[in-house]
Amino acid sequence: MKKIQLGQSDLHVTPICLGTMTFGEQVDEATAFDILDRSLERGVNFIDTAEMYAVPPRAETFNATEKIIGNWLSQRPGARQKLVMATKVAGPSRNMPWIRGGSPDLTAKDILEACEGSLRRLKIDVIDLYQIHWPVRSVPAFGGVYYQPASGSEGTSIHAQLEALQLLVQAGKVRAIGLSNETPYGVHEFVRLAEQYGLPRVATVQNGYSLLNRSVENALDETLHRLNVSLLAYSPLSFGLLTGKYDVTGLTGPGTSPEARLTKFESSRKQRWGRPAALAAARRYSALAREHGLT
């Protein structure tokens, strides 16, 4: 499988990345091991996780995914050398009090401590790509549309966060840095400050992108192109809506698999993917695909 360079970093990854947010919730450890083994056998060299996972987030499964991956790596001698390992530090708690005691900020100290925790759980010496999971700033992320300047505190500055990330890079604990759920403004500021002050340059932005989520095309695409920052597109199948498995039954109707994510978790149905318009659009895309002999 060919490799793609991430931004201006020295990381080269396969076009397919294994996302792991279900490990520790829908997917138990034994099944997760099978998935990881299969992925490695098929040539995928890129694994992404986060300290917040498993999803849907709750206190009982906080950090669970990293622990499972760490157990797998410790039992697979030689696997680590073949892989690009990416994880994320959680942003402000945002109604998740188990994250740093409900802090509304992500300080430099928080970043340093979170990195140590991820290294320990993953049982590795260096994180190849370390990402900020969502901004400290109030932004329309996770299905939001409109920017609300009056909501939320600005918190720790981007400059201070970059300085903390620089310490991790200099210590050999992180190779490259990235962002997630970011805006064009945020990406531009991270790159501008990095270039102005000689700090680590963002290599990637991990945002949702699919037929049902085209927000990347609202100026973020140009920003990434001009600044040479790579997009890591998450939820390409829109939480399973684009697989067609909900087309006939709906999200909770008779015949729906009880283990299907949007059926099993009410919290997921209350978010962007559970909106009636999302299912209606997915059904129309499925019909269009069938008309053209596509799956």
Predicted regions and their residues:
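N-terminal small/glycine-rich loop or linker at the start of catalytic domains
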Residues: G7-G24, A86-G102, Q131, V136-V145
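Active-site mouth loops of central-metabolism enzymes
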Residues: T20-A30, P97-L112, Q148-T156
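Short, acidic/polar
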Residues: V27-S39, T107-R121, I158, L162, ...
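Conserved, mostly hydrophobic/aromatic
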Residues: L6, L18, A32, I47, ...
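Active-site gating/metal-coordination segments in enzymes
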Residues: N95-Q131, G208
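Beta/alpha (TIM)-barrel catalytic core signal, keyed to glycine-rich beta->alpha loops juxtaposed to Asp/Glu
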Residues: P135-T295
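Phosphate/pyrophosphate-binding loops at sites that engage ATP/ADP/AMP, CoA/4′-phosphopantetheine
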Residues: P77, E116-D125, E195, G293
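N-terminal binding-site loop/beta-alpha segment at the start of enzyme catalytic domains
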Residues: M1-K88, L112, D125, A164, ...
